[in-house]
Regions:
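Outer-membrane beta-barrel transmembrane domain signature
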Residues: 71, 83-87
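Residues that define the transmembrane beta-barrel architecture of outer-membrane proteins
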Residues: 39-43, 86-90, 132-136
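Gram-negative outer-membrane beta-barrel transporters
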Residues: 3-74, 141
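Outer-membrane beta-barrel domain signature
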Residues: 32-36, 78-83, 125-129
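Generic recognition of flexible, low-complexity loop/linker segments
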Residues: 53, 91-92
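Composition- and surface-driven signal marking solvent-exposed, interaction-prone regions
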Residues: 60-61, 80-82, 107-108
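Asparagine-centered polar/low-complexity signal
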Residues: 44, 80, 91, 109-112
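C-terminal beta-signal and adjacent terminal beta-strands/loops
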Residues: 7, 69-77, 95-144
């Protein structure tokens, strides 16, 4: 599976006029600036490989899955002064199936990529939410 996207989203009519405390007008023109929170590029590459095991095997089926998700550049403000560059995370999963039971071993952000998941400004301060670090897990499933 392969998906990619390019977005060119800019302001076309966004001008703000505010007044200073002394009454002097300040005009800010955002025309041509990128719209915040919209990644310029997104990318997803994924694949799956399944092995049907022999009747003598303990497992009925083994499935390997991997995908790479990427996004960027993402601007966080209308001024386009804070942004996240293009980044990607690699995820994988291995499923071991035995009849109606399955055990899965998985990892998210396997390359431990450091990235900003979200950013906002309030009261003249910027706050950034970091993306999740590398995670590992095991899932157990039983169908009735």
């Amino acid at each position: 599976m392969y998906k990619r996207q390019y977005t060119y989203a800019t302001f076309t009519d966004y001008v703000i006029t505010e007044e200073k405390k002394d009454g002097t007008p300040i005009t800010t023109d955002y025309n041509g600036k990128y719209v915040p929170f919209v990644p310029k590029h997104t990318l997803n590459i994924g694949g799956e490989y399944a092995i049907t095991c022999s009747p003598r095997s303990i497992f009925d089926r083994v499935v390997f899955q991997a995908n790479y998700n990427a996004a960027g550049r993402i601007y966080w403000t209308e001024q386009n002064d804070v942004s996240q560059s293009f980044y990607g995370t690699l995820n994988w999963r291995t499923n071991l199936e035995i009849g109606d039971a399955m055990i899965s071993f998985w990892a998210r952000n396997f390359l431990n990529k450091d990235y900003a998941a979200f950013y906002f400004e309030t009261m003249n301060k910027g706050f950034m939410q970091k993306g999740r670090p590398m995670q590992f897990g095991v899932d157990l499933r039983c169908r009735f």
